[in-house]
């Protein structure tokens, strides 16, 4: 009886902790979005933001800066950061490996290769590449790459070797992309180079509409599968015992993770370490790995991480702008190393 009461108390304590952490993340995200709107080459006072967002001073320079540059950019960082974090969480669950993420497994590189191929072909024919076309190309590249990784997984029992295989697949895709660039025209090379560095800048409102539809829809699907995801975390045998069709569920996980990763790669280029670092940090803060608790916090954490890194990327050495991947790697890599060392000590 005492043991049962203790377990109930611990569970209610964890639930309360999760609610508090999630609320704090939401508040931090709102503050960070406000900072992104205010800070830049043109400083916009915080008390001007509500008026600008409500449609006041529509013709002022501050209004144009917010509506045409900063707001689309910060929304892109928030949505794509959350998507990348969720994708990392799904892949870590799928492979049962804490360092699995779209960048490490080569999924981002595969998406980059197909987008580059499509971009060069279309630009060579003097045709613009639409936002849906970029997402479709990146999704195809993600699926092809993760398909290769899964084929390798059938022959390799060690998850560590699987990660190495994913890295090698990523290198092959990167080499193929560089090969394509060598034969592209000057304009294509410039476009591909700028895109491949990774950045949330340049997002139009049409891009934001596509990003929002894809990310919100897929994230809702991820949240809808929290129960089978919880069962899957406890092992395939347990998942089967509670009625989960494991083979079909694995396909669903791959499709959802690939779609999220593809959307990020299509609009921001390859972004590293977000998918590894954020899920670890979120689970450590929540003291829980239950998907129903981790998924919302993971999305908020990814949004905060990318919005913060983007603010640093565009303001630290202004007017020179850093690649978003350079900043995420600077902050993400030490976090991953620290967490792995902490786990090894335990």
Task: Give the residues covered by each predicted segment.
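Alpha-helical transmembrane segments in inner-membrane proteins
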Residues: 2-346
């Amino acid at each position: 009886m005492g043991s049962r009461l203790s377990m109930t108390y611990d569970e209610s304590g964890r639930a309360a902790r999760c609610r508090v952490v999630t609320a704090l993340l939401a508040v931090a995200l709102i503050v960070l979005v406000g900072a992104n709107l205010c800070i830049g080459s043109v400083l916009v006072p915080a008390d001007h933001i509500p008026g600008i967002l409500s449609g006041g001073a529509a013709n002022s320079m501050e209004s144009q800066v917010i509506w045409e540059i900063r707001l689309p950019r910060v929304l892109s960082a928030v949505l794509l950061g959350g998507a990348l974090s969720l994708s990392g969480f799904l892949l870590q669950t799928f492979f049962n490996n804490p360092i699995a993420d779209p960048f490490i497994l080569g999924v981002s590189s595969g998406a980059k290769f197909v987008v580059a191929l499509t971009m060069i072909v279309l630009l060579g024919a003097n045709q613009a590449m639409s936002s849906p076309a970029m997402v479709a190309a990146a999704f195809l590249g993600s699926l092809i790459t993760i398909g290769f990784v899964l084929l390798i997984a059938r022959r390799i029992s060690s998850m560590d070797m699987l990660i190495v295989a994913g890295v090698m697949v990523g290198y092959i895709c990167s080499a193929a992309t560089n090969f394509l660039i060598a034969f592209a025209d000057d304009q294509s090379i410039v476009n591909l180079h700028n895109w491949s560095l990774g950045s949330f800048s340049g997002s139009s409102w049409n891009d934001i509409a596509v990003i929002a539809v894809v990310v919100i829809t897929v994230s809702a699907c991820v949240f809808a599968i929290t129960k089978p995801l919880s069962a899957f975390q406890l092992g395939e045998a347990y998942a089967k015992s509670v009625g989960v069709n494991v083979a079909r569920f694995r396909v669903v996980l791959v499709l959802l993770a690939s779609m999220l990763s593809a959307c990020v790669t299509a609009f921001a280029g390859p972004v590293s370490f977000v998918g590894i670092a954020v899920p670890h940090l979120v689970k450590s803060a929540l003291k829980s790995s239950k998907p129903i608790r981790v998924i919302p916090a993971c999305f908020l954490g990814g949004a905060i991480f990318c919005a913060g890194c983007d603010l640093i990327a565009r303001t630290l050495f202004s007017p020179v702008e850093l690649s978003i991947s350079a900043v995420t790697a600077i902050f993400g890599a030490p976090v991953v190393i620290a967490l792995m060392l902490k786990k090894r000590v335990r």
